[in-house]
Amino acid sequence: MTDEERYRTALLDWLACANAGAAEPAARAAREAGDGLLERVTAAGAAGHVLDYDDTYLPGLAHLSAPVAPAALLLAAELGLDVAAVLAAYCAGFEATGALARAGHPALYERGWHPTAVCGTVGSAVAGARLLALDPAQTDSACAIALVRAGGLRASFGSDATLPLYRSTASAR
């Protein structure tokens, strides 16, 4: 399997998870928050993770698609971009999330932070920067802003509403 096939498969897997999770209470509640781009990204992120069937990246103990896929898909749709742009942005965000999660593992998790929420926020910024064709300085700024807004305490584990919210709000930041 080529790298492109792996990314396409991971994105399709996330879409299947989002479809399966769309009827869950946490996903329905997220959809009721509004219909702006950020609210739609948050709702899609919640649906994609609420059943916890999405990808798990063990070297960084994170779900890489949960924050990045909804951000890439919905921003690209908003901008009228094609599937190639979605896939390129998704790949960039997926790799950034994985690299950060791997670099912070296991310390990030052991100190009470959830790598998906923290690292995925930056990965989503990378995906968005790619779609918006930001230059390197603008991309750095977008990542810095995302990191300032990142959160994700492990204390929320076991909560039907809070845990999917971390994944979904990472997409929207």
Which residue ranges define each predicted feature?
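N-terminal core-entry segment
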Residues: 1-173
